[in-house]
């Protein structure tokens, strides 16, 4: 799944103002899957979403798609150290269920994102978050891209020495 150099430039032109923000850069501090940081995971999801839209001719709004993908896990905490399962009541407070809400609140607060971008972020964990169903093509694309990236990162991008994979190389082996 590789974007052309021109497509990468187009994608980066959309997300550049978000990418340089200090709070987005904070996502580099947190591990997402295996040894991949949350920042790298979100970048991977943006690249895969853009690729799916272009290659499958899905005609999605590329700005909303790219912004929603980049910010879909903008929750800004280490989910590995928060909470444990203590029965059914606490189930919906666990990270998998709750982080889309935190990410959406943070994105609205920091960037004043659109309703469509909010929908993308809020529904990206469907079907786990069964009440937040993707309602636009951009949300479906990001939801699928997120699942794909999570599998690739968890199975194939694990560090054997505990090093963190981040920043310079994405899921297809190239920079932005």
Model-identified regions with their sequence ranges:
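Metal-dependent phosphohydrolase cores
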Residues: 1-176
């Amino acid at each position: 799944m590789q974007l052309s150099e021109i497509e990468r430039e187009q994608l980066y032109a959309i997300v550049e103002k978000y990418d340089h923000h200090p709070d987005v850069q904070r996502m580099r501090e947190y591990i997402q899957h295996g040894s991949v940081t949350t920042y790298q995971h979100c970048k991977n999801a943006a690249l895969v979403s853009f690729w799916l839209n272009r290659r499958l001719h899905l005609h999605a709004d590329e700005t909303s798609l790219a912004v929603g993908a980049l910010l879909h896990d903008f929750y800004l905490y280490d989910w590995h150290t928060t909470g444990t399962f203590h029965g059914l009541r606490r189930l919906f407070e666990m990270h998998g269920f709750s982080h889309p809400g935190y990410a959406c609140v943070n994105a609205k607060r920091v960037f004043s994102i659109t309703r469509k971008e909010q929908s993308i972020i809020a529904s990206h964990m469907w079907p786990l978050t069964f009440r937040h169903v993707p309602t636009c093509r951009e949300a479906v694309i990001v939801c699928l891209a997120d699942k794909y990236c999570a599998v690739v990162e968890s199975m194939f991008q694990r560090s054997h020495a505990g090093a963190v994979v981040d920043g310079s190389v994405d899921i297809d082996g190239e920079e932005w």
